[in-house]
Amino acid sequence: MHIESYLTNLLSMDGIAIYYGKILTFAEANGYFHSLLQNTPWKNDEVVVFGKHIVTKRKTAWYGDSNYVYIYSNSIKQALPWTRELINLKHLVENLSNTKFNSCLLNLYHDGNEGMGWHSDDEKSIEENSTIASVSFGAERKFPFKHKQNKKIISVLLEHGSLLLMKKVTQKNWLHSLPKSKKITLPRINLTFRRMVT
């Protein structure tokens, strides 16, 4: 039986979010965290909000099977070729989730002063209703979901070396965010494996 059969859906309706918890040992997670922090060609994220061009403190990097172009908030990103580390993580996540991914967006939050507001990963360049796998390294951060209609909020704490899956119609019906917290002084790296339209 697939491991997911033993795990509980975090969402009460209109979507599926499965939290696997830690999928790596502490030593493995530390190794990936420090290597990604030092070796990734991080760039400040650039977005357009209400017509204003904003350069965020949060940094990103984008990898994929081919030279994908990803459009996010009117910002164009071009995929870099996979590294060996990311391929290893991709294979691990694919085996656990029984899903194939063709791209990965990396986010670096330097501390709790950096976060993300409410949004859905429902851009046209992402396959509709496809699974998105989120792997977290570094500081533990609260990750809330908010239903788009009834505004119900459900939260999970994303641990160092953990995996969260968001599946099917989750992006249509739920928003998610990464709230800021002054208590958090350590960096966090998040990898979101996705299926892009080809």
Residue map of PLM features:
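Non-heme Fe(II) oxygenase metal-center motifs and adjacent flexible, charged/small-residue loops
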Residues: 1-198
